[in-house]
């Protein structure tokens, strides 16, 4: 079972066992082509999420009604792309195996590949 993050996305407070969605950060930017810094995105997204409107006109409900668990950021080694993608894939696989939906925040675009690999193997 994953541990709860202290600073959560939009203040989500579900327990892991009850959550349908599990958020995790992948702070990685080793292959960016212009300016590094996307590794700080997951922390910035969480910090700014407290100011978001909770009502979704698309869902016609409060986003706080969704059962979300924030498992925090992975510790990813700068410069080791292969290991970073493997770690992201492992986290996504754990979440999928537990019957939950992974919600990845990054990081550069490449971090998506790890989660996609896990989903392809499952489905």
PLM-predicted stretches and their roles:
Residues 1-123:
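Metal-dependent C-N hydrolase catalytic cores
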């Amino acid at each position: 079972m994953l541990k709860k993050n202290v600073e959560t996305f939009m203040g989500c407070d579900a327990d892991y066992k009850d959550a349908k969605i599990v958020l995790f950060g992948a702070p990685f930017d080793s292959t960016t082509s212009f300016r590094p810094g996307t590794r700080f995105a997951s922390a910035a997204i969480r910090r700014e999420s407290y100011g978001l409107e909770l009502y979704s006109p698309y869902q016609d409900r409060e986003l706080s009604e969704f059962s979300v668990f924030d498992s925090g950021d992975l510790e990813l080694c700068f410069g080791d792309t292969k290991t970073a993608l493997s770690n992201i894939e492992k986290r996504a696989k754990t979440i999928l195996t537990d019957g939950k939906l992974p919600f990845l925040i990054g990081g550069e675009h490449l971090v998506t590949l790890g989660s996609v690999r896990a989903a392809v193997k499952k489905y």
